Amino acid sequence: MAKEEIKIIAQNKKAYHDYFIEETYEAGIVLSGTEVKSIRMGKVNLKDSFARVENNEVYLYNMHISPYEKGNIFNKDPLRTRKLLLNRHEINKLIGYVTRKGYTLIPTKLYLKRGLVKVELAVARGKKLYDKREDIARRDAKRELEKHFKEKQLGI
C-alpha cells in the first residue's frame, strides 16, 4: 500500500518541553465548515489546549481556531469546546490513564489525513523543573558533540 499523505498544520512543541509523552492516539475532531477552512489556512493554536474525558466522551478545550475571514455569521467561538472522535476501547484506555495521578491528555499535532482533520492526542505526565533543566543540558551536550564531530570531519 502507498504511504498515506499527512500534512501537519500545527504542532504543540511546548508539550514536549513540559510533559513526558507516554502514548499517542489519533482522533478525529468535530468541526464546523468555517473552522475547517480556517485550519486549512493554518490559523490554529494548540499551545494551552488540553483534553478531558466527560460522560465517556473526549472533549478538547482551549484550542484556538481563528475565525474565517469570509465566514461572517457562520463563525463559531474560537475557543469553544470540541468533541474528539475515538473508539470505545481507546476511550476506556484513556480513562484508565487519566484516573492515575499526574496524567493528562494533551494534543501534540493537528494534521490533515486524506482530507480529514485529525488530532494526535498524547497521554502525558508533567515534568518537574529539574527534569526540564536535565533535558536542556542533554540537548546542549548533544549539540556540542555534533559540532565537535563536524569540525573534526571538516578538518578545522
Swiss-Prot record:
Q: Which organism is it from?
A: Thermoanaerobacter sp. (strain X514)
Record flagged with keyword DNA repair: no
Signal peptide limits: none
Q: Which GO terms describe its biological process?
A: trans-translation
Q: Name one Pfam family in it.
A: SmpB
A GO cellular component annotated for this chain's UniProt record is: cytosol
Q: What gene is it encoded by?
A: smpB
Tell me which InterPro entries the record gives: SmpB (IPR023620), SsrA-bd_prot (IPR000037), SsrA-bd_prot_CS (IPR020081)
**GO terms of molecular function:** RNA binding
What's the protein name?
SsrA-binding protein
Family stated for the protein in its record? Belongs to the SmpB family.
PANTHER family found in the cross-reference section: SSRA-BINDING PROTEIN, TMRNA-BINDING COMPONENT OF TRANS-TRANSLATION TAGGING COMPLEX
Q: Does the keyword RNA-binding apply?
A: yes
Organism placement in taxonomy:
Bacteria, Bacillati, Bacillota, Clostridia, Thermoanaerobacterales
Q: Where in the cell is it found?
A: Cytoplasm
